[in-house]
Amino acid sequence: MPLSLAKSGPKPYLWDMIADSGRSVAFTGHRTYDGTAAESLSAAVERLYGRGFRTFLSGMAVGFDLAAAEVVLTLRAAHPDVRLVAVVPFRGQEERFSPADRVRFLRAVSAADEVEVLAGGYRRGCYAVRNDFLVDRAALVVAWYDGSPGGTRYTLRRALARGREVWNLHPSGGGLAIRPVQPALF
């Protein structure tokens, strides 16, 4: 079942009208994420809530993005002031997912407080547009980055260039000038 949220005409994103990016967190990570940092991710989101962050943006890709969205929804069950913003790069993205991941995606999108669909269909560069949207609307980025090239590296470099705080939950630290957040710190 394709995403059926319509966005017509060149109007400002709802996000731009209501959100405070200074109190927002974005997630970025590899699609190959297998859940190994589930405890660290949950602890990080709880810690960020304790620091006053209430809005969490997920790029809604398979892997770390969906896992992060699910953690935020769990936190929201205990703290109704938490908001999940599902940032979907293009309409129909979920059609490229496995059946199990499609179900997870649709469940998270349906439960999100806000959904931003950035393009009517796939086009070259749409993932970079999504990544820019995430970084530009967050004060802090939580990552699962192992040092490999790709969209996660691009997103973290953009975040660092824009002075965003970055937490990398991957135990290797990923090789960028960011420190990994160790589970023991939580």
Q: For each predicted feature, which ranges?
A:
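Acidic/glycine-enriched connector segments
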Residues: 12-186
